[in-house]
Amino acid sequence: MCSFLDVEVKDRFVEGDFGMSEMVKSNLANCSSRVKRPMNAFMVWSQTQRRKVALQNPKMHNSEISKQLGVTWKLLSDSEKRPFIDEAKRLRDKHKQVSDYKYQPRRKTKSFLKNVYNHKDHLTKATDQLIKTQHLKEDSTTIYENTMKCPEISSFYCAQESTYLDNWMNLPPEQENTEFWQGLFTNETETCRSLPHGQMDCNECRSI
């Protein structure tokens, strides 16, 4: 017994109306009437080879099959490629007889172009940030190197660091928080006094 749903589906199938939009129908009609480009020698050869590889490896993905065929084709000698090269030439000559042929590459979708532009913008921003960071590092290194070239400043900082470290290592644990910091400022004053008068740096030395 046939239901109402079966009758409706069967009628739509017979009429050929699958609920497709007019744009989809138009694209299908254009694809069926469009003249395809002729195959090259590799495509002619891979037609039969692809079937063989697919039968031998049913679970192999199509992209992996293509990679394997590409490697195998490169390993073939010129004499082995010759029949397929001749066949490809015959197909090209036959294709030239079609006067209304026009190369029509596939149009890239808007979403694809948007992803390309977004990726390009991201790379540009990342590159700019990397350049700015590199410039900051170079400037800091140059300032430090120029500063340490001055003998008075270099010896002053080296003496400070050595004095602070020695005082801290020689302090008992119960006095490290008070005497260390008191000695720090005392040593700073003594170190500054050893410098020429115009290069004194601490507040006490400036008042001398």
Curated annotation (Swiss-Prot):
For molecular function, the Gene Ontology terms on record are:
calmodulin binding; DNA-binding transcription activator activity, RNA polymerase II-specific; RNA polymerase II cis-regulatory region sequence-specific DNA binding
**What organism is the protein native to?**
Sminthopsis macroura
Q: Which UniProt keywords apply?
A: Acetylation, Activator, Calmodulin-binding, Cytoplasm, Differentiation, DNA-binding, Nucleus, Repressor, Sexual differentiation, Transcription, Transcription regulation
**DNA-binding region as annotated in the record:** 35-102
- Compartment annotation: Nucleus speckle; Cytoplasm; Nucleus
What PANTHER family does the annotation carry? SOX DOMAIN-CONTAINING PROTEIN DICHAETE-RELATED (PTHR10270:SF324), SOX TRANSCRIPTION FACTOR (PTHR10270)
- Output this protein's name: Sex-determining region Y protein
> Which InterPro entries does the record match to this protein?
HMG_box_dom (IPR009071), HMG_box_dom_sf (IPR036910), SRY-related_HMG-box_TF-like (IPR050140)
**Claim: Ribonucleoprotein is one of the keywords in the record:** no
Q: What does this protein do?
A: Transcriptional regulator that controls a genetic switch in male development. It is necessary and sufficient for initiating male sex determination by directing the development of supporting cell precursors (pre-Sertoli cells) as Sertoli rather than granulosa cells. Involved in different aspects of gene regulation including promoter activation or repression. Binds to the DNA consensus sequence 5'-[AT]AACAA[AT]-3'. SRY HMG box recognizes DNA by partial intercalation in the minor groove and promotes DNA bending. Also involved in pre-mRNA splicing.
Q: Name one GO biological process term.
A: sex differentiation
Which cellular component terms (GO) are annotated to the entry? cytoplasm; nuclear speck; nucleus
Which Pfam families does the UniProt entry name for this protein?
A: HMG_box
- Describe the processing and modification events after translation: Acetylation of Lys-110 contributes to its nuclear localization and enhances its interaction with KPNB1. Deacetylated by HDAC3.
